Amino acid sequence: MARKAYQPKRRSNSNQNQQRSDSLKKNKQDNLRSKSAGNQQGNEKNKKDIQDQRNKASTKKKRESSGEKYESARDKVIRRFRPGDNALKQLRQYNQTPSLLIRKLPFQRLIREISTRMTEEDSLRWTSFALVLLQTVVEDYMVSFFEDANACALHAKRVTLMSKDLALAARIRGQKNVTGIFIPTKK
C-alpha cells in the first residue's frame, strides 16, 4: 500500500476571518491592559525621578558647603567676564613673565635691515647675546612709552589710545620725530 502525503485540513474563509477578528480583539485588550499598567509604572517612575532630583540638589548643596569638586561638567557654572577683564588678566600675566614679548627671529631681521640701511657695509655681524640684550632694552622702552601714552589718554578722559597721545608722551619726554617712522638711509 502506498503512503499518501500528509495534507492538513483546509479551513474555510469564514472560519479564518473569525479567528483574525478574535486575535485583533485580544491584541486590543492586551494593549489597553499594558497601557493602564504602564501609567501606574510611569507614575512610579515620575515619583522616582522627582526624588532623584531632590537628592541631587541636596548632595550638590552638601558638596558646595564642604568645598568638594563638581560632579560633572554640567554642574560647573559658566563664568562670563566683563568687557576688559580678560585684557587686564593678560596684562598681569605678561607682567609676571620674564620672557620676551616680541618673537626673536622677526626682531633680528628688523635689526639687520635697519643696520644695513644705516651703514655703508652690506652686513654687520651681530652676536646672539647682543640681539637679545637689544630686544630687552627695546621692549622695556616700548612698555614705558606706552604707559606714558596711556596716562595721557586717561588724562583726556579717554580709554582709547590715539596717535596724539603717543606724540604728547614723546614731546614730554623730549623726543623729536615721533609723528612718523624715522629710519635714516645710506649717505
From Swiss-Prot:
Bias-annotated ranges (Polar residues): 34-43
Pfam hit, one: Histone
The UniProt record lists the keyword Iron: no
Gene Ontology molecular-function annotations: DNA binding; protein heterodimerization activity; structural constituent of chromatin
Biased composition (Basic residues): 1-12
Region (Disordered): 1-76
Keywords: Centromere, Chromosome, DNA-binding, Nucleosome core, Nucleus
Gene Ontology CC: chromosome, centromeric region; nucleosome; nucleus
Biased composition annotated in UniProt, kind: Basic and acidic residues: 22-33, 44-55, 64-76
Domain of life of the native organism: Eukaryota
Keyword Lipid biosynthesis: no
Subcellular location: Nucleus; Chromosome, Centromere
Function: Histone H3-like nucleosomal protein that is specifically found in centromeric nucleosomes. Replaces conventional H3 in the nucleosome core of centromeric chromatin that serves as an assembly site for the inner kinetochore. Required for recruitment and assembly of kinetochore proteins, mitotic progression and chromosome segregation. May serve as an epigenetic mark that propagates centromere identity through replication and cell division.
Family to which the UniProt record says this protein belongs: Belongs to the histone H3 family.
Subunit structure as annotated in this protein's UniProt entry: Component of centromeric nucleosomes, where DNA is wrapped around a histone octamer core. The octamer contains two molecules each of H2A, H2B, CENPA and H4 assembled in one CENPA-H4 heterotetramer and two H2A-H2B heterodimers. CENPA modulates the DNA-binding characteristics of nucleosomes so that protruding DNA ends have higher flexibility than in nucleosomes containing conventional histone H3.
Name of the protein: Histone H3-like centromeric protein CNA1
Originating organism: Tetrahymena thermophila (strain SB210)
Gene: CNA1
